[in-house]
Amino acid sequence: MVNIDIELDPKFYGPKDSIVCSLLSHVMVSEGISQADLLLIIGDDDLLADLKNKFFGINHYTDVIAFRLNEYHKKNVEGEIYISLPRVKENANKFEESFHKELGRIIIHGGLHLLGYKDDTKNNKLEMEKKENLYLEQVNWGKLYG
């Protein structure tokens, strides 16, 4: 079973839990994971910048950070995904994409990172983008809000 808890900074209006859970559950099951305990935390730029600096020694804004809490060779997944809602909105404008689709993509992206996918090279980025596009086609992300 894929268990997902969602925490939201109270200054934001968050996406529908059911759609977020559908996206992440679909990624996990499609990638062969039947047991997962995930925490999705939706916050702001400062939260993610602090995490990026503290854990990676990099001082800049980012839209998503994922931490796998157990070993990658384990069949179950325990992890946390942090998303900056303002950064997702800015990136949606930058990439001329709807906010809902960009948020769906970032949720999927975080899930893929928990599974060991990396975006540190051009080829790895392309592989992740293919997976993101595939899963965006398969799940109804269009109603993340409202």
Feature-to-residue mapping (PLM):
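An acidic/histidine-cluster motif and surrounding catalytic segment
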Residues: 1-104, 115-146
